[in-house]
Amino acid sequence: VAQAIMEYLDCECTYFPSMADDDPIMSAYSYARRLGVREDFIPVLIKPDETLLECLVMNADPENDADCYEFNPKAVEEYRKKMLSAPVKDGKAVLEELTGQRKEEAEEDDMDWEEEIIGEIDGGINNDRFASYWDSDTNMTVPLILAKIPVKNPWEIFAYLPFGNWNECLDTLELMAVAKYWFEQYDAVPAAMSHDELEFLLPAPVPKEKAIDVAVEQYG
């Protein structure tokens, strides 16, 4: 499945087998980030599995009724061009609409938004490493792909990695809009992902006075 995802991405990729220490992964990622500034690519760490491949193919090659391993590369390329040429939506508006929906649901369930959903900031831990690529059962990393996505702007990676648009997940243009908004607000860059997780790298923590607002945006 990792090979199929690398073929789907059609860009320079490095495969990392499972390991007990993620230093080699983070060293390669950090180097790729520096190199990407000069060579116009954004590095992303990807946890490969069949569900992710199915999501990518479902979005980029919707006519494909066959096995997800047998996607049409031309259709995928056209999809990328279409997504990259589309105007980027207002990310703040996308998040506000989603938060509004969550508030309505809470009201329907007789839940107090401020007390039961928001609550208070309490405790917390230092979050200084990615979580999505660790296997909690073995305390080892899962197999990973480091992909050098050939785009200039961080939010454009979703043209290559359209992993949403199922259940209540955002579609590709919404993902791009939200990622652009968070980049403009916090310099947040999509950095690691699986079929149902997305982690951003920030140069500094979100300011404490903004933390609740960002948490609500993510909850939406």
Regions found by a protein language model. Name each.
Residues 117-213:
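Long, positively charged binding patches that form subdomain-scale interaction surfaces
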Residues 1-156:
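Extended, low-hydrophobicity segments enriched in charged/polar residues
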Residues 29-32, 179, 215:
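A generic alpha-helix structural signal
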Residues 213-220:
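Helix-rich interaction surfaces within compact, conserved domain-sized segments
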Residues 1-14, 22, 176, 182-195, ...:
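Proteins with a high burden of low-complexity, intrinsically disordered sequence enriched in S/T/G/P/A and R
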